[in-house]
Amino acid sequence: VTKDPQAKRKPENCAFVIFGVTGDLTHRLVMPSLYNLAAEHLLPEKFCVVGVARRGQSDNELRDSLLKGLRQFATRPVDDDIAKKLLECVTFVEADAKDPPSFDRLREHLDSLECAQDTGGNRLFYLATPPAAFAPTARELGRTGMMKENGAWRRLVIEKPFGTDLASARALNGELLKIMDEHQIYRIDHYLGKETVQNILVLRFANGMFEPIWNRNHIDHIQITVEEKLGVGHRGGFYDATGALRDMVPNHLFQLMSLVAMEPPARFDAHSVRSEKAEILTSIQRPSEEEALKSSVRAQYLSGRIGDDEIPDYRKTEDVKPGSTTETYVALKLMIDNWRWAGVPFYLRTGKALGHKRTEVAIKFKQAPLSMFSGTAVDRLSQNFLTIGIAPTETIELQFNAKIPGPSVTIDGVEMKFRYGDYFRADPSTGYETLIYDCMIGDNILFQRADGIEAGWEAVQPFLDAWKNAGSNGIETYQAGSDGPACADELLRRDGRSWRKFS
């Protein structure tokens, strides 16, 4: 993260190697992000892209495919000159981790390309592949010596999901750390590329009005919501083996939670920030099986209409097992065992096929003493929320009470809202630009470390175990296009609380 936007420096010359270059992720996010960086003059002076896939094609065929993807998914109008210059540096290599000689050919191609284009031997390997290919690909990179740093840097970018449970996450970390050092691994979470997410630390620690009251003495509870309108679609096979908890909680929601709840880092650097984030995840209480079932909600969507689209029952989705117990919605109540947050519940929820698309963090402050308002309309006091909106718009909103004009003391809730777009000019982006740029300059402050990954999985493992033992018992339903299952409201109602209403 660059502190001064005017001080951004060009990354060192490098080769950018994309495994899974023919896939959706490359076309939809990675290449549009590289294009935006090129448009902002934030790519290295000497730069080349090497696309890797299992099925062969020519350099020109790959360039045509990537250009088509740019025109379809770019977040800003495509300048032909910029696109041409970017795509001219693209070459293709056919390689498969199951075919070791193909990785020898990849190494030879990179060696030759680096001599010709003077990229200095620096290499960024981006795994835009299915998770099953992560470890085999890393092993081949290690076997061929392509991760060795001999006067040049070598970095590996890995997409989520990073494991499917605590055991698999530990195993994958173990595999990677046999091959390379922790500083070479960039576990990417695109949520951290969003400006509002990055601004959470600034909001907390750069404003004297917030940090003194950011604790159990003044905060009643915190809600973290990630709602999606889309159903599972054509990803039934993947999703049925994953579910909402595995797909969203250990990464996206825990990243938001750790930024909101972490202690102030000693310094604003990668080691200090990542250590505090891992520490807060380690401090999440581990519930018993009975407590895990009581503190969680899981549900599947039934058929319904969202806009003009008819959404079928989740269990009738292609490649979903007829009697599936995989959740498309999850809500959790979590507690943190430390001095700052003792007794403050964190309510997390995420789901698919819901009536709204939104991502937000809502901090509910404790109610002020009401004795001075005796005899007035105190029942109309609204809740004091500080809400950090991440999607669909990036906002910070403060909800508080004020007197309605008139002779009597009547109180109502009012809002102050800050919208990023009203104050700062920013070109539309994918959210990946900052992350890819940081990978190239070697700033890993926005990327997860092995201990943080494992702490996240350790925190959700009790829920996974409890659900597995419960089988289909406890699976609720909700209609597609609704606000989710009624039992999610009950999770808070038992504590005398309610979810913040979408406005």
Can you name each region flagged by the protein language model?
Residues V1-I158, F162-S503:
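Secretory/organelle targeting and membrane-embedding segments
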